[in-house]
């Protein structure tokens, strides 16, 4: 009876681990999808801003520095995720794992919002400058604002 009880205890303990892993996997998948979106936002916006004649070389350098900082923070988030995923091979309490995943999720969501806001502000600045120069249609076409 004791042997059977121990067997079932071990079995249920493993089931709890699997359940936790599956729940964490969904969050990790969401984080990775947001990271991919952020990289795509950066690549698309940066390609457009480099073509935009309404920005000076100094402004483009400033933008690149901002993007570099955002990407560096993104890498830190990925490092934290790897730590959590690798923690399945070692011991880490589920509460600690969940705490790290939640923190990374919050960071990535905020970084994605910040990047979208930064891109939007730069597009608006270009539109403002274009309207002052009478080049509004050029900028609208560049940023797909009119079809």
Which ranges hold each PLM region?
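N-terminal Sec/ER secretory leader and immediately downstream segment
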Residues: 1-35
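A structural signal for well-ordered alpha-helices, especially hydrophobic packing surfaces
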Residues: 19, 43-46, 71-78, 108, ...
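Sequence-level detector for tyrosine residue identity
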Residues: 8-11, 25, 42, 62, ...
């Amino acid at each position: 009876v004791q042997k059977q009880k121990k067997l079932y205890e071990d079995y249920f303990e493993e089931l709890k681990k699997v359940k936790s892993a599956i729940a964490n996997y969904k969050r990790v998948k969401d984080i990775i999808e947001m990271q991919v979106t952020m990289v795509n936002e950066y690549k698309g916006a940066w390609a457009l801003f480099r073509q935009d004649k309404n920005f000076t070389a100094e402004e483009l350098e400033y933008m690149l520095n901002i993007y570099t900082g955002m990407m560096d923070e993104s890498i830190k988030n990925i490092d934290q995720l790897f730590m959590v995923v690798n923690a399945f091979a070692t011991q880490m309490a589920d509460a600690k794992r969940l705490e790290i995943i939640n923190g990374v999720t919050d960071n990535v969501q905020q970084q994605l919002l910040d990047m979208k806001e930064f891109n939007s502000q730069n597009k608006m600045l270009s539109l403002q400058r274009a309207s002052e120069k009478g080049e509004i249609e050029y900028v609208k076409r560049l940023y797909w604002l009119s079809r």
